[in-house]
Structures are given as C-alpha cells and as structure tokens.
Amino acid sequence: MLNNFLNLELLNISLSYPFLFLITTAIVLLLCSGFWKFHRSFYIGISSLSLIVSAFLILNNANAQGLEAKAFLATLNNDIVSFYASLVILCFSFLYLLMQKEENQGEFYALFLFMIASLLLMVSSSNLVLIFIGLESSSLALYTLIAMRGSDNAISSAIKYFSIAAVGAGFFVMAVAFIYLKTGTLDLSANLALKNEFQKDPMLLGAGVMIFVLCAIKLSLAPFHFWLKDVYYAAHTNLVAFISVVPKVAMLVVVIRLFDFLNNTGFEYIIIVLAIFSMLIGAFAALSQNNIKKMFAYSSVVHSSLVLIACIPLLKEQNFDGILLAIFGYWTLFAFANYAVFMILSNYENNSYESLNGLLVKKPLIAFCLSISVLSLAGIPPFGVFWGKFMILNTVILNGYWYLALFVALSSVIMLYAYLKILIHVLFMKNDRVYNIKFSFIQNFILAFCVCVSIFAILLML
C-alpha cells in the first residue's frame, strides 16, 4: 500500500492541479491583502485569471488522459460528471466575479477561491471522506461570505444556515460510518457491486437516506429549505445569484453518484414523494410572498426539485448520458436567466414588487432584459428554461415516470402566476421615481449575454 502511495504514476497529481492552483492563488491574495491595499479590479482580475487557468488545466487533463482517469489511489475521478460540473462551476463563478460592484476586501476573494477549490474537489471525488471535506470546506467559506456581504441580518442568516447544515453534516458522518461498517470501503463507485446487499440490509439503505438529508438541505428541497428565505433576503443580491446556482451544482454531482450507487434498491419511491412535495410546497409558498427575493427563494426550491426529478431514472440504471444532458442542460439555462434577474435586482435596495413600477417607461431596455429572463424562468417557450424543462420531461416520460410530468406541469402553472406578478409591475404599473441603474461595460455585456442565451437557447437543441 505504501509503495502504491509513493508511486507518482498511480498518484497522478496532475488531476489535482485545478484546485491546487486556486488554493495557491487564494493564499497569495490573503497574504497580499494583509500587507497592502489594492483596488477591487486587482482582486477581480487575479481571481478571474485563476479561474480561467483552472478551467484550462481541466481541459488539458481531459485531452491528455481522457475522461476515465483516476488519481490518488482512485479517490479522485476525471469522469464525464466531474468534467461538466467543474466547467459549469468555473463558468458561473467567473461571471459572478465580473458582476462585482463594491467589494474591495482581499479576504473576500481569497475565501471565494478557497470555496471554488473545495467545490472542485467535491465533484471530482467518489470517496465519501473527500466529498465531506470538500463540502464542509466550501460551506464554511460560503457562510463567511454571506456574513461579510448583505444587510444587517446577514450574520444571523449565515448562522441559521450553518446550524441547519451542521445537522445534515451529522447525518452524513453517521451514514459514512454505517457504510464503512458494512462494506469496508468509503468509495461510492467501489460499492456499485454491492447492490444485492443494499436490497437486503436496511442499515445501508438508511445510510443512503441520511446522506440524502444533507443533499436536500444543500439543494434547498422542502422540508429542508427553512434557511433559504432568510439567506436570500439578507445576503447581497449578486451573492444570492451565485448561491442559487454554483454550490448546488456540486451537490447535484453528489446526488448523481449517490443515485447511481443506490439503483434498484427501492430508494426511488422516497425520492419521488420528496420531489413532488418539495415542488408543490415551493410553488404555493412563492405565491404568498410580497418580496421579490423571497419569492425567488421559493422559486429555487421548485427548480431544485425539477432537477431532482431528472435524477430519479438513475435509480433504475437508465440512459446515463441522456439523463446527464438533461440535468446540466436545464441547470445551465436556469443559471443564465437567474443571473440576469439578480444583476438587475442588485440595483434596488428595496426588493418589493412596487419598486419595479414604471420600469418599462423609465428604463425600457432593462425592462426588456428582466421580462425575457423572468419569462425564461417561468418556462415560457421559446425561452431558455423551457427547453431545459422539455429535456427533463422527455427524460422522465421515456423512462416510465409519466405521472411526474403532471406534477411538473402543475407546479409550472402555479409558478407562472408568481412570475407574472413581476411582469405586471414592470410593464403596466406607473411610477414617477427616478431609476438609478448603472452597469459597467462588462456588466452590460454579461447581462446581454445571459439574455441572449435565454432567447436563442433553441439553437442549442439543433
């Protein structure tokens, strides 16, 4: 074992370069910020460049070693799941950095890079210990970022998020202990040969349920979503856009690996009930909100539930590549529309619906961008999220879960009323206030790009 560990060829250290580079950059930024003060553009430039280099290293590894490479005694995987997830994480982290307007603290960007490195570690491993290390490292950094930016309630909301997630982490650790007790291994991919034992042993199935509790908390699935509304309301608006997309990508990878591990065990019935319950609770709760950010908090519950539904066929060993395309396709299209909405909302201190009154008259171009993005999130054709939802429905129906499509349609109709409330205020309500909406050239470009993706997403289907 020791000889294997010292064998550099088996270690394959190059697979760890993407997140090691981010960690090194974060340490340098942290040291620099302790001795010198730099402008925000310096921190954004260095952080953005490090993300680009990390993406290049991932692409280089995929080109040189393919998508079956392993490292550190097969605890790190360069498979198709980690490849796509890593690129999505880096892409939307890069966009988030370019959306920054005010943050000048070097510690903020150092913590941000530490978090992204932890997320990359998390999606690149099927080893439960490394997944837990990546999860907790990224979560601790995220709690701090929430507390550093936002309203006066940001600290209390971060503590609430931390407290609820700590309970989920306890379930995860106990589940890991149960799995190791029964199988003698901590690798999810190694356990795939033990499906028959899973069917017979309630302890192992219970361990899978306990792991999923933490996944549900991080994906903000009902009834594990109680932290979400407070965080959305208190955190800085641009950070909310990031929270709603990037950390959930890493958690989706854990769900994909877990479901691939638990297939043919009867676990699917638990997930089906939870997904339907979560989707409907989120949709009905969104209708009753008077604050836009809180409405989008419950909207994200619905979107997370939809992606969970796309994962369900994995529990029956169905077409893996097709399911993966539906999951990442939907989430990417959702992310672009979501970023556009929150970029516009970041200009408002008051996120009530009334604050959007008269936007069409005063800022018609901004009103157009907001309307297109909201229609996309609502799943109205021919805009982006509609095609993502189409891929999910196609996947679940082809795999025999046609009844889930009915609940998806019901939740979509309910959410349509919540989204239309925004459009009514933007397009038809009058207001004499002066809108002070300012974007830099880069931010204007990001907004235009996100809206164009929503408009021309149909081209991706060809």
Curated annotation (Swiss-Prot):
Keyword set includes ATP-binding: no
One Gene Ontology cellular component annotation held by this UniProt entry: plasma membrane
Membrane topology field: Multi-pass membrane protein
Similarity remark: Belongs to the complex I subunit 2 family.
PANTHER family: NADH DEHYDROGENASE
Quaternary structure annotation from Swiss-Prot or TrEMBL: NDH-1 is composed of 14 different subunits. Subunits NuoA, H, J, K, L, M, N constitute the membrane sector of the complex.
Protein name: NADH-quinone oxidoreductase subunit N
Organism whose genome encodes this protein: Campylobacter jejuni (strain RM1221)
Chain's gene name: nuoN
